[in-house]
Amino acid sequence: MSDIKDFEIENGALIRYKGASIQVEIPTGVTSIESFAFKDCKEIESIKIPKTVASIGYFAFSCCDSLEKIEVEEGCYEFRSEGNCVIKTGREVVVLGCKNSKIPESGTIVGIGNYAFSGCVMLDDIKIPSSIEFLGEGAFYGCAGLESVVLPDSVTCIGQGAFKECYSLESIVIPSSVALISREAFDGCSENLVIIAKKDSYTEEYAKANGIKVSIK
């Protein structure tokens, strides 16, 4: 288990984890996990977030290749965990995931937040539930193991860099419900990437305009 000395904390903000434990329990009293706090901590397998945490920065757990279990302590006002996802409460959005994440199909989760799975290179499969309306900026940025994605008819927006540098991504089904795709959504993806779209849809036009192969279904 982790030791308090392994954490660099300033005024309740967890700046950086400096330990080498495979099971990490963030100390109670931490109110924010700053951007890059656990970046490249490749040995961590599980993380427990205390109920005192009110904010989690972008890329906080990026490139944690061994991370397979994420838990938020019960009683947290801002976040909850389910299916190894951290979910922002209220209008529910997934803000953090790992290679073992299963996005809940409860019907309450409306989006995948900015950089939620960024740097999750070991993620090779993800099911997007039919309640999801948007993919935030960099939602799957750097998910180099992801090979195929099917977006449900509920999705309307794909954010900037949502699938940037997903080097193994070869197919993605995008429904006609999607009305906005960022120009940089697929930057750095394989030349073999095929977007599967409806004929005469916005997505078909997007693929052709951006030099991406398109298959009509």
Language-model regions, residue ranges each:
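Structural signature of tandem-repeat unit edges
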Residues: 1-13, 18-32, 41-55, 65-111, ...
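Consensus positions within tandem repeat domains that build extended binding/scaffold surfaces
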Residues: 35-37, 58-60, 114-116, 136-141, ...
